[in-house]
Amino acid sequence: MMEIKHYESQEIIKVNYFWLRDHCRCLLCYNTETLQRKYNLLDIPRDIAPEKGGFKYLKDGKVLQVKWTDGHISDYDVDFIFSLQVEKFQSNKAKSTLKTPWNLPIVLQNERHIRFKLTDLIASDAVVKDYVSALIRYGIVFIDEVPASTAMTEMAIRRVFPVMKTFFGEMFTFTDAADHADTAYSKVYLGSHTDNTYFCDAAGVQALHCLSHVDGDGGDNFFVDGLHCALELKRRNPKAYDILTKVQVPAEYIEKGQHHTHSAPMIRVDPVTQEIIQMRLNVYDRAVFNTIPQSEMMEFYNSFCEFLEIVQSPESQWRFKLHPGTVVVFDNWRVYHGRYAYTGKRTMTGCYVQRTDYQSKARVLGIID
């Protein structure tokens, strides 16, 4: 281990020799055009260490130069080394205020921040950044004044994100016709859920647009912030929260030519920062539950039911009717959505966006790290 002192704060950290050698950014080790390492990790001796007296500070302590026992010389930016430590990473995540958990009163107070006109979105890159920032913060945004067609809905989404292709297609248009083995393809009540719980990598973002609803009524949509609900469960019952972050809940989708299955917790947390990174809930797609012993079942079901009480409470649910001309875009890893039963003929269109594309856009715009 090497002790490194910060030139301003005088803080001292200890870093592993091999890790330090692995993070050399000289032109022999790092391709500055592709931003990729250039060497085989096995090229570094396992017992790598600085030569005796082989390190010194340059440029008033801002640069650390190390002469290694394999003959390599590395110059390190001291701020760079300090910024890469796990404690710094955890601290930055803990202090992050990018996301605003919401219930009904909070989201209604902030609705003006999450509505965007299609013409403004097309005309201004600054509006695109505001749109993605709002989606990161609240998990839901609206694009207004979109002509009611699948083609125009696709254009509105592709202005910012590429569209994800699944067995539903890229853009999907649906009614109550049973085109797929899914409750969404019906007129019945559809409770709060996330899509694709049966995929190994569920869509990160979903978009929906009601193209028409004639000769009937009902069909109000509703949205629930799963992040708020999870934090509320953690406050009320930390043990129940812990159970839902650990128990693997199986999901399954079966129709002719398709059989998808995946198991994961209902609340997924980052193992390093403990930050909530994905909410996963779909009572319709739950498969046979065989991932924990029977002796633990009741404790899980009690936790599950307590969580559902929060999710289904009136204060958590934002209910409204989608009309032609408004596209709702929401974070499928955070926000639950559902629909009340309806009569008549209702036509919806929509699509998915991969999580990695969503986050890539946010990084390119400088919104997240």
Residue ranges with predicted function:
Residues 1-123:
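Motif-centric detector for short Cys/His coordination patterns
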Residues 99-140, 145-329, 333-369:
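Active-site environment of non-heme Fe oxygenases that use a 2-His-1-carboxylate facial triad
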